[in-house]
């Protein structure tokens, strides 16, 4: 890793936001939401679908599943996985 500490959560959310990746978000109460992240901060995520936006608090999120595979970092040159 380089000098900057990578925050996986922010890296993931920024990647799916920039690529407009459709996500399925499961909340802790079992509700399933789908849409595209248009904005996020330390406490919440703005999810957009069919022209409507939903502000979702991160503490209510259980799982985030992208519709397609996401590669956040380049594979290391030494051949190690993970």
Swiss-Prot record:
The keyword Lipoprotein does not apply. GO terms for cellular component: cytosol. Keywords: RNA-binding, Stress response. GO terms for biological process: regulation of DNA-templated transcription; regulation of RNA stability; regulation of translation, ncRNA-mediated. It comes from the Bacteria. InterPro entries: Hfq (IPR005001), LSM_dom_sf (IPR010920), Sm (IPR047575). Pfam families: Hfq. RNA chaperone that binds small regulatory RNA (sRNAs) and mRNAs to facilitate mRNA translational regulation in response to envelope stress, environmental stress and changes in metabolite concentrations. Also binds with high specificity to tRNAs. Belongs to the Hfq family. This is RNA-binding protein Hfq. The gene is hfq.
């Amino acid at each position: 890793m380089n000098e900057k500490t990578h925050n996986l959560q922010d890296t993931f959310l920024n990647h799916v936001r920039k690529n407009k990746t459709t996500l399925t978000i499961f909340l802790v109460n079992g509700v399933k939401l789908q849409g595209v992240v248009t904005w996020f901060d330390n406490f919440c995520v703005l999810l957009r679908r069919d022209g409507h936006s939903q502000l979702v608090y991160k503490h209510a999120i259980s799982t985030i599943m992208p519709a397609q595979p996401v590669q956040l970092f380049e594979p290391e040159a030494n051949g190690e996985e993970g």
